[in-house]
């Protein structure tokens, strides 16, 4: 057995590197890395469906197939990217260099996705598939390394919560500005030419993402260096996913959240355009929803330390159900009440997202403790895969539901299509949030158990 003094010294040394070693400058720099991704990712999620139907004139059924095929292919790339990340070794670390390498391709493919060529109907569809697939691959090459950095910068539960919360506050600021400014920017730049307006808006966002990525690259550091072990085969590395009950419960819950959240996000513009009949309120609705998310994230570290992260997820998500039910029964003419429900849903729903991305780093340590294999990339990529699968299912569901309901762009909508849009902003997201609550209730990794796992890992490393 290792001596008590040696374990104590090892813990003290480790704490000095993880808990006290992160300055606010570095936390903010890390947040900028994820902010750069989400400015683009959420812009695409919120507006690409609308861009294709109302600007490109593509039928919803065609878009449904495009979204499902491209996003599933994109999601399949995530585990591959995870394996690539696990085999990456540079003088800058494993994950950090991707902030530099991917910054420019990521920006380029964003611009190309919102560029409509004149290749004819078939040529334009091929172009849409190719550019969207390339954008999705660059998404993976950006987000998987960024998310794995949490576990490489610190293994303190408290520090990870602060780090993830700081990151998510910046993410929600980015999303807030990205989504709320998109329509005004596109209108100001393009006027009646929406295609040009959205293209230039995408170019502006792409340029901002490059700056944020580079800032993040130059500010973050990888401190946690796991003990070197012999290389594992791909099959054995992937096996850590299926032996990891905390991860399986976390990603199942997150899938339900991602479907519900993205159904609402991608149809909010329809809700204000056709149901409320005030397209100009898209800006205010977005500000309230993501502004509320930003505010709620300020309280997450305090309540997570007091009650535990799983309990905070369950309580806040349960409270969010009231807002979805309230929105469903609110008349379209009651604008102030609609805004109140939007604020409440943003405030109480988004902690699910924030805490889940922090907890996945714990699942990496759990896998190492249980199997002896540390596979940051593979574990993190499973979360990214689920996120993209949720986006794919949400986008396809929304497009199919609009088609079935008889939606026709740029006309007065039927009662059936108005009800479909309302359902996708209220009852349907509420159902998936309820499912997410039920699944996360079975997440077995408590803060106390996690600290015990870290203690055992430290003792193993010292032997």
Swiss-Prot record:
First and last residue of the signal peptide: none
Superkingdom to which the source organism belongs: Bacteria
PROSITE patterns: MFS, NA_GALACTOSIDE_SYMP
Gene3D superfamilies, A to Z: MFS general substrate transporter like domains (1.20.1250.20)
Keywords, sorted A to Z: Cell membrane, Membrane, Sugar transport, Symport, Transmembrane, Transmembrane helix, Transport
GO molecular-function terms, A-Z: symporter activity
Topology in the lipid bilayer: Multi-pass membrane protein
CDD domains: MFS_MelB_like
Pfam families cross-referenced by the UniProt entry: MFS_2
InterPro entries reported in the protein's UniProt record: MFS_2 (IPR039672), MFS_dom (IPR020846), MFS_trans_sf (IPR036259), Na/Gal_symport (IPR001927), Na/Gal_symport_CS (IPR018043)
One GO CC annotation: plasma membrane
Membrane spanning residue stretches: 28-48, 50-70, 99-119, 126-146, 169-189, 200-220, 246-266, 283-303, 312-332, 335-355, 389-409, 426-446
Coiled coil: none
A GO biological process held by the record: sodium ion transport
Compartment(s) where it occurs, according to its Swiss-Prot or TrEMBL record: Cell membrane
Function: Probably involved in glucitol uptake.
Family, per entry: Belongs to the sodium:galactoside symporter (TC 2.A.2) family.
Protein name, UniProt field: Probable glucitol transport protein GutA
Organism: Bacillus subtilis (strain 168)
This protein's encoding gene: gutA
